[in-house]
Amino acid sequence: MKYLTQIRLGCLPLLLCSFFLVNPVRSSASEALWKAASVSVVITPEENLWMAGYGGRTAPADGKIHDLWMKVLVIEARDGHRGVIVSTDTLGIPQSIYNNVCAALKKKYKLERSQIMLNSSHTHCGPVLRRALNDIYPLTPEHIKKISAYSEKLEQQLVDAVGKAIKELEPATLWAGTGFTSFAVNRRNNIESEVPGLRKAHDLKGPVDHSVPVLAVKDKDGQLKTLVFGYACHNTTLGIQKWCGDYAGFAQYDLEAMFPGVTAMFYMGCGADQNPLPRRTQELAESYGSRLAHAVADTVRLPMVELDPELKTEIEITDIKLADAPTKAELEKIAAGNPKSYVTRWGTRLLKELNAGETFITSYPFPVQVWQLGKTQLWITIGGEVVVDYSLGMKKEFGPNTWVAGYCNDVMAYTPSLRVLEEDVPPRKSSRWGYEGNTSMMVYGLPANRWSDEIEDKIVESARRQVKKVRNGK
């Protein structure tokens, strides 16, 4: 099933237009209010840990451009049902941290997994976390010890921040809107060096999602308190050795300067196959951040739709099969390669496990989550590095009042659509194809070269079941 692949570029402006045609002014909300509170915590490592995101790095971080942040927004509906939204300046939250945080929040605050939305900005200038990307870098036992200590501290900071936000809950109103900015480029269909010319000629190729979903939180007096906003584009303008939130970090800093006293929170959309192009300089990262911030600010200054104080939350952890594991002969060949290569480290580790009699996993417990805020606003989250097909397809199926976030709850691998999986099977028609649907699995350490072809169906079917529940009630 490839319904997601039928989306075309022309659909996005229609979706955005239909949003404002259907909802030109705010709806009439109940007199009862939401409750909400946000908390910000600096998570910049105190030590120069290894940085996550680029396999070519040869040393840990050596400074910072600006601080890294974790921000928490807790919302409470009229009936007392709560939702926790977490944004982090990290590459991706791994399963171990997600599971530990969920267990702690359930124990301390009786929050179920469905009520917790944990997003990573996917900055490539943040720290390596526990049990993530360990084959990519030449990590010593001392490095791993420091990474584990940082990860444990991060977990505690997150739990404490949620508790602080719960204590500070105050009456609030929630508002939804959508902006637009166009610096994201489909990296599978455009050669990076050619992008300036292609953009000038209006000839960029491939699906994109240039929408900027915005959730605004105001206090009972109408004062803006928190802005949550998303964008579907890799957070990879920079490749430096200094801590930085990249364009998403600059956007949050800009918004907090534009609106003093407001907490700005970024979430990554379905941007796994999208890049900010051109890139490679801090000036460009600041420029993209400014463009994104202004798209959010413009949205806030225009009429937005007020959301009734109703919240429904669902989640499913669905087993999705991996494709065939590499054979022992294949692993022996890989392990004999360049010892400095992460591919060699991946093959060596798997070969050692195989020789020790260990069994490789054949499927992965994959998170798909659906919230409904008010009577119509859907918010779907998908684990892994999610390609843009999912965002475009789900907005087409479920309606324009649908936000889709990738990089949520567990970033275990790339999350390709069936289209991308098929394009990435050798022989490939493009030199840009192959990574998202194939070789990236080695980066994340999984014992397979790709997901099975069922991945798109499994994710979409899970979303459909949950959308039906939140729309119709259990």
Briefly describe each language-model feature range.
Residues G10-L12, C17, G126-V128:
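Alpha-helical and His/Cys-centered functional microenvironments
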Residues S18, S27-S28:
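Serine residues within intrinsically disordered or low-complexity segments
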Residues N23-R26, P303-E306:
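N-terminal non-cleavable signal-anchor helices
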Residues S30-N119, T123-T263, Y267-G271, R280-S287, ...:
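Conserved beta-alpha junction segments in alpha/beta enzyme cores
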Residues M1-L14, N23-V25:
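Bacterial N-terminal signal peptides that target proteins for export
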